Amino acid sequence: MDEGLDSFFEESQKSGPRNIRATAEMVWALEAVPGVEHLMAYESRLNYFIENKPWISICLYNLTKFDGATIMQVLRTHPYTISKGVITENPFYQNPDIWLKENAPQFLK
């Protein structure tokens, strides 16, 4: 993940500074896709990647499709939430150093 995103970002900046906006509909994660068991580690690590970059990602988790335990993990790995069109700082967010240490230490930076 890290190398692919780094490469994409570097390529996007070659002709001058560019802001990056990305969205991801996450319903695919409900399927038995190889590696999906590491999704929250990826989500947490993404915070390392986008730090200090002109990059905004919006992960779209359908609250009617994901169970409560998964949504709580989502909240712990995302610094902001959007609900009813309002962006707010997420009080449940955990810094990746903390979240990864407690939940997926093999993915620590």
Label each residue range with its predicted role:
Residues 1-109:
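Non-catalytic regulatory/interaction regions at protein termini and inter-domain linkers
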